[in-house]
Design a protein with these regions (language model features):
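Acidic, two-metal ion nucleic-acid-processing modules in DNA metabolism proteins
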Residues: 1-278
């Protein structure tokens, strides 16, 4: 991954103090040195990480819901105590159909139920609200979970805590490849994937936004919904052109503006400049 301590150490001569390790660091600097620090640390990243390392989640075992039993959880207890040098196992549950989602803990967390071939699994996702959950009942999802045992009224239950989730069938290699190419292009470097959103692609994106009456989830969530029709960069530039043309507004969420006339997207500065660079 990106070594934040190494990056900050590279700027040590303009810092009043600093410390940390590869995953976290703290520092102090004078106000007059903020601009210099910003340039130095960004130059370090560009020179040492032309493509930023991909954040990965290790799945220790792919698991069918039918093998999600108390016996399994009890056997996992033999591996304790878990910690930095002995990570708690993460299990992958793939191609489950979402059957129920409910807010718990004053709306700060989610209780999620999903099923596969008649076997239902109950899970909890902490620090995620209903407004942040982009999926609907009937969607097919993959889950990465940690398992433990909880006891209520003298009865033991399986506790499945969701570490991460995603839509099933996602081509994650395509996502990272296209995202990296887009970011490198923004830095002035050549790209290997299509970036220009032609009329048909713009139509796909705009029709989807209209069908959803805007979009309240993340850019990546929107990309995964449309990934079969476009590239990461094409979506990014299409949204930029929409906003410039007054079709949408982006303030966290995407909202559709009430537009009475057709917009000529090809005449936007966004697409004119893009076409000139390609």
């Amino acid at each position: 991954g990106f070594n934040i301590f190494e990056a900050i150490s590279n700027c040590s001569d303009i810092l009043t103090h600093f410390g940390g390790h590869p995953l976290a660091a703290g520092m102090g600097l004078n106000v007059k040195d903020i601009a210099a620090f910003r340039k130095r640390i960004n130059d370090f990243a560009k020179n040492n990480y032309p493509v930023m390392p991909i954040q990965t989640l290790k799945i220790d075992c792919k698991l069918s819901p039918y093998y999600l039993t108390l016996d399994l959880v009890n056997n996992l207890a033999e591996l304790e105590p878990f910690g930095t040098d002995n990570a708690q196992p993460v299990f992958g549950l793939y191609n489950l159909t979402l059957t129920n989602v409910a807010a718990i803990g004053d709306g700060k967390h989610l209780k999620i139920e999903a099923a596969k071939k008649g076997k239902s699994v109950r899970m909890v996702k902490f620090r995620t609200t209903l407004d942040e959950f982009p999926h609907k009942i009937g969607d097919t999802l993959d889950f990465a979970v940690k398992l433990s045992k909880s006891t209520f009224k003298n009865k033991d239950y399986i506790s499945a805590q969701i570490v991460d989730f995603r839509k099933s069938g996602i081509d994650i290699d395509k996502y990272y490849r296209e995202k990296n190419d887009y970011l490198l292009f923004k830095l002035g470097k050549k790209n290997k994937t299509e970036l220009y959103p032609n009329r048909d692609i713009c139509a796909v994106v705009y029709k989807y936004l209209k069908s959803q009456k805007g979009y309240k989830y993340t850019f990546d969530d929107l990309y995964f919904e449309l990934a079969n029709y476009l590239t990461y960069g094409q979506l990014a530039f299409a949204l930029d052109a929409f906003e410039e043309a007054g079709l949408i507004k982006r303030e966290g969420n995407i909202t559709l503006n009430d537009v009475k006339t057709k917009a000529n997207l090809e005449r936007t500065d966004t697409l004119t400049v893009l076409k000139g660079r390609l």
